[in-house]
C-alpha cells in the first residue's frame, strides 16, 4: 500500500525478485517536447483568441484557514454577468467562463467580479463574423489591424496587500466581544428555521 500523508515510510521487506518489477519511463524528454508542440498547435488553432483560454472569476478559498486568500475560480455567476450587463449566451461567445451553480454571498465579491468583467469588455477586440458586414459592438478596422494574440494570462490575478493606517481603537469597538458575536451569528443562522417554526406554532396556539 502506498504511503499516504506526511507519515514515516515503512521498511520495505522485499522477498520476490523486485528488480524486474521496478517501473521505468524513458520518454520524459519526448513527452516534454510533445506537450510543447501541442501547446503551440492549440495556440495557432484558437488564434486570435488568448492562449490561456477563458476569463475566470476571482474567488476566495473555502474554510476559515484559507479564506484570506484569493484564486481564480471556475466561472462567473449569473448575478455577476447581470451586474456587468452581459447575457449568459453572449458571455460564452466572447471568451468568458460561466458557472451557473455559483451564488454570490457578499456584495464585495459581486462588485469585484462585475468590475473584472467590465474591464475585460473594455479591452476586448471583437472580430466581426463577416468582415464585409460588421455589426454593432464589433471592433473598428483600426483596432483589428493592431490585434495580437495574448500569450500570458487573461487579466492576471495580482496579490497586492494593502495595509491600513494605524489609528486609535474607538470605544464602540472596545465594547464588541468579537468571539461571542461570531458565535451568536453562527447560531442565529443555524437555528433560524427552527426558531421561526417554533414562533409560528406558538402564534397558532395563542389564537
From Swiss-Prot:
Annotated compartments: Cytoplasm
Q: Which GO terms describe its cellular component?
A: cytosol; cytosolic large ribosomal subunit
Q: Does the keyword Transcription apply?
A: no
Q: Which Pfam families match?
A: Ribosomal_L13e (PF01294)
Among the GO molecular function terms of this UniProt record, one is: RNA binding
TM annotation in the entry: none
Extract the InterPro entries matched here: Ribosomal_eL13, Ribosomal_eL13_CS
Main subcellular location of this protein, as a coarse class: cytoplasm
Q: Which GO terms describe its biological process?
A: translation
What domain of life does the native source organism fall in? Eukaryota
Q: Which family does it belong to?
A: Belongs to the eukaryotic ribosomal protein eL13 family.
What is the role of the protein in this entry?
Answer: Component of the ribosome, a large ribonucleoprotein complex responsible for the synthesis of proteins in the cell. The small ribosomal subunit (SSU) binds messenger RNAs (mRNAs) and translates the encoded message by selecting cognate aminoacyl-transfer RNA (tRNA) molecules. The large subunit (LSU) contains the ribosomal catalytic site termed the peptidyl transferase center (PTC), which catalyzes the formation of peptide bonds, thereby polymerizing the amino acids delivered by tRNAs into a polypeptide chain.
Q: What is this protein called?
A: Large ribosomal subunit protein eL13
What is the species of this protein? Caenorhabditis elegans
Amino acid at each position: 500500500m502506498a504511503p499516504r500523508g506526511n507519515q514515516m515510510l515503512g521498511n520495505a521487506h522485499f522477498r520476490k525478485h523486485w528488480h524486474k518489477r521496478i517501473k521505468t519511463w524513458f520518454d520524459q524528454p519526448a513527452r516534454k517536447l510533445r506537450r510543447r508542440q501541442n501547446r503551440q498547435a492549440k495556440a495557432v488553432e484558437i488564434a486570435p483568441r488568448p492562449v490561456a483560454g477563458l476569463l475566470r472569476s476571482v474567488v476566495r478559498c473555502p474554510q476559515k484557514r484559507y479564506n484570506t486568500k484569493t484564486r481564480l475560480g471556475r466561472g462567473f455567476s449569473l448575478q455577476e454577468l447581470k451586474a456587468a450587463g452581459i447575457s449568459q449566451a453572449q458571455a460564452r461567445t466572447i471568451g468568458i467562463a460561466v458557472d451557473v451553480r455559483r451564488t454570490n454571498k457578499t456584495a464585495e465579491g459581486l462588485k469585484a467580479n462585475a468590475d473584472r468583467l467590465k474591464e475585460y469588455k473594455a479591452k476586448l477586440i471583437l472580430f466581426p463574423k463577416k468582415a464585409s458586414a460588421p455589426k454593432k459592438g464589433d471592433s473598428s478596422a483600426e483596432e483589428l489591424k493592431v490585434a495580437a494574440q495574448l500569450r500570458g494570462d487573461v487579466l492576471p490575478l495580482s496579490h497586492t496587500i494593502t495595509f491600513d493606517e494605524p489609528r486609535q481603537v474607538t470605544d464602540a469597538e472596545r465594547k464588541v466581544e468579537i468571539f461571542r458575536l461570531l458565535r451568536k451569528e453562527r447560531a442565529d443562522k443555524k437555528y433560524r428555521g427552527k426558531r421561526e417554526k417554533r414562533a409560528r406554532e406558538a402564534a397558532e396556539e395563542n389564537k
